A protein has these predicted regions:
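Short functional hotspots at interaction and active-site rims
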Residues: 1-129
């Protein structure tokens, strides 16, 4: 999630260190400027594999961690809250494919609302110097 946009990938399993590296590679293909990634403390984010991958980028990607147990500081939590309440309320997909396609479609639609993305950052009260 940038201040005006967000990037996502859907995986058919729980996110582990390998998926984090795949997603970082995906970001690097789409964003041509250095990145600051603000992460929660998911163990995969702090794994050796992810650390080695980040080290191989020679400072192109910097990371900061949110304090433990502070979902209110994570703008992604506000994105998910909005998504569940306003984009997919009462959705009952017939199968995993239908769920995946519905998620992809609604997340892409949210990308076209930069003011809303900006509001998620403001709600989180994160300060950038």
């Amino acid at each position: 999630m940038t201040l005006w946009n967000f990037y996502f990938q859907l995986f058919d399993k729980a996110i582990a260190k390998e998926e984090v590296v795949v997603f970082l590679s995906y970001l690097l293909q789409r964003i041509s400027s250095p990145l600051l990634i603000v992460w929660d403390r998911l163990p995969a984010h702090k794994s050796r594999l992810v650390g080695e991958f980040l080290d191989s980028l020679n400072g192109w990607v910097a990371t900061e961690y949110l304090p433990p147990y502070a979902p209110e500081l994570n703008p992604v939590e506000y994105l998910w809250g909005h998504w569940k309440q306003h984009e997919l309320p009462n959705v009952c997909p017939k199968d995993l494919w239908q769920l995946s396609e519905g998620a992809r479609r609604t997340l892409r639609r949210l990308r076209r609302r930069p003011c809303l993305i900006s509001a998620f950052w403001k709600q989180s009260s994160l300060a950038f110097d």
